[in-house]
Amino acid sequence: MRHSKSGRKLNRTASHRKAMFANMAISLIEHEQIVTTLPKAKEIRPIVEKLVTLGKRGGLHARRQAIAALRDAGKVAKLFDTLAPRYASRNGGYLRIMKAGFRTGDNAPMAVIEFVDRDVDAKGAVDRARAESAANEKEASSL
């Protein structure tokens, strides 16, 4: 019987789920909005909300716990320095899930998960910077 079993398996092994959720959390912290399937969005929300709470707590131990979960010190720095102060006055509910229709191909329910009061410029900022630097290098090499 399945009584009192929490969480979804998502047709993956435990190690695959753990790695996938860590990667999704990193992407969500970096871009502040991602598009994924609805079950994955529902599973990632409590993970990232606990990480934001760790960021609000501050301190060395909380930072080390976040690094252990995310495996990316740069994103942990953003979590503690940018996101935690932004949500200092909010007690939970840092993320929102919006349904986004169905995926073409397999008709899977899709969702957009994003931070409440997110920075709109954060989405795609890394890609824009990468494209801009590539264009600058191309100009410099052509001169």
UniProtKB/Swiss-Prot annotation:
Which Gene3D superfamilies does the entry mention? Answer: Ribosomal protein L17 (3.90.1030.10)
Q: Which GO terms describe its molecular function?
A: structural constituent of ribosome
> What's one GO-annotated cellular component?
cytosolic large ribosomal subunit
Swiss-Prot/TrEMBL GO biological process terms: translation
Q: Which UniProt keywords apply?
A: Ribonucleoprotein, Ribosomal protein
Q: Specify the domain of life of the species encoding this protein.
A: Bacteria
Family indicated by similarity? Belongs to the bacterial ribosomal protein bL17 family.
Its assembly, as annotated, is: Part of the 50S ribosomal subunit. Contacts protein L32.
- This protein is called what? Large ribosomal subunit protein bL17
Source organism: Bartonella quintana (strain Toulouse)
